[in-house]
Structure formats: C-alpha cells, structure tokens
Design a protein with these regions (language model features):
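Glycan-binding loop/region signatures in secreted carbohydrate-active enzymes
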Residues: 1-46, 50-51
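Substrate-binding cleft and catalytic face of glycoside hydrolase catalytic domains
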Residues: 22-33, 41, 55-162
Length: 162
C-alpha cells in the first residue's frame, strides 16, 4: 500500500467528496437541473460518498494521511435559498463542519463560489449582469459574519478562468 505521500500530493489534495456531498434532490436548485436534463433519471447520484454526514471521519482519515488543510465550498443556495432569507440550519451545519475541521487539526480553506447559484439569483441573470454582484457581496458579508472568525483562508471563485 502506498502511504508515502509527497509534499506535492499533500499540498494538492482536494476534497472531491465535498463537491458531491449532497443527496439526490437535496439542493434547492436540483429540480431545475434534473427537469432540464435530456434524461432526468441519469442525474440520480444517491448519497455519493455521504461526506455531508461522514465529514468528521473523512477529516480524521485526511489527518492520518498527513494532510494539514481542507478545501471546501459553501453552497450559496443552502445559505440563502430565497432572496434575502438566511437558512439558520445551513449556517449551523457549516459552523459544525468548521468545528470538526478544527478538532481534526485541519486548516479550513473556504471557496465562496464553486459554480452553483441559488435559483433566484440565476433567474435574475446570475453573474452575467454586473448589477447582481451586490447579491454575492451580501452573501459573503453574511457568511463572514457567521464564520469569519474561524477561517483564515478564503478563495473567492473556484477556477475563475473556466
């Protein structure tokens, strides 16, 4: 078994499970995505790696592998599913997630935008309309008010050139 991780491998480790942490139908915009598909049944992914529930175990495994940080994204549509309506349960989830990272001794690296949008924001034209940036700023302000004290590293946009 290969357990000798190079420094490059440790530095480049990403959390693919975190990108697929939600169960089928769990995201507020899921019905819109599935209904637009040529074959909606082809979009069912089940629980994927079930990272949403097993994150503490995943963090322990990452620490055992020698990782020192954990990059993940915050799902805007969970935090603000309706325009101006903040989801207290979603915020509580991310606070618990960050606490589990701290307990595991992993430095959180938070990505604010990783390609998904709340349905209401997309309906307004998303980022294609310059005036809509104010909604993203409002989301970021709220998020940092809630978790900013526990986070040192923030990535604004995942892969901004994509």
């Amino acid at each position: 078994m290969h357990n000798q991780w190079s420094e490059w491998e440790k530095a480049q480790a990403k959390t693919l499970a975190a990108q697929s942490q939600y169960q089928y139908g769990d995201l507020p915009n899921w019905p819109h995505i599935a209904s637009a598909a040529k074959d909606p049944n082809n979009y069912i992914s089940g629980k994927a790696a079930n990272h949403a529930e097993l994150y503490a175990q995943d963090f322990a495994l990452a620490k055992k592998m020698g990782l020192t940080s954990w990059r993940f994204s915050v799902e805007w549509s969970r935090i603000e599913p309706e325009e101006g309506a903040w989801n207290a349960e979603a915020i509580k989830y991310y606070k618990a997630y960050l606490a589990a990272l701290a307990d595991a001794g992993l430095e959180p690296v938070v990505t604010l935008f990783h390609f998904t949008l709340p349905v209401w924001f997309a309906a307004r034209g998303g980022f294609a309309k310059r005036d809509n940036v104010k909604y993203f700023v409002r989301f970021v302000d709220k998020l940092m008010d809630e978790i900013g004290a526990t986070v040192r590293y923030v990535i604004t946009i995942n892969e901004p050139c994509v």
